[in-house]
Amino acid sequence: MKFNKHKNLEGLHAPFSASKSHWLRYDDERAMEVYNNMQAKVRGTKLHEWAKMTIDLGLKQPRTKQTLHAYVNDAIGFHMDTEVVLFYSKYFFGTADTICYRNNILRIHDLKTGKHEASMEQLLVYVALFCLEYNIKFADLKDCELRIYQNDGVVEHHPTVEEIVPIIDKIIHLDKLLTANEED
């Protein structure tokens, strides 16, 4: 038999694929919820790609209350780098949407396109990874500013030593544990 070629689908995964067949037990409402969530993730990815390109090109946006415009304009204004991987080990790394470290001030900003309220925890981990990778003591920073841009609002947080040091300690501990386990 000569099978049909679907070149446009190679490397893609169907929203309701055979390998993730739990959808067989979905009612109509759940199926639509799952599909809409998948579409929102695709949209979020495209918005992140657009924001990165816009920031990298330095294309300021109109001053509006739209989250995306504020995120882009702030990143350009602070001369932030986009999509920076912060690496401690093969077990612990992550990609910060935008980041800058200048004059002993660390800024990490994150764009969230979902409807559910985002947690600052992810950005706290980025701070810990930054400190570990660049061998900077958090207590020595003049300031650390974290921002989440979501739903036409901005949440800003200035973490404390008491928040960051336990995360650093946990990363170091778990990395040693995982490395030792791998060597056995």
Predicted feature locations:
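Mg2+/Mn2+-dependent nuclease catalytic core
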Residues: 84-177
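Metal-dependent nuclease catalytic cores that hydrolyze phosphodiester bonds in DNA/RNA
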Residues: 1-95
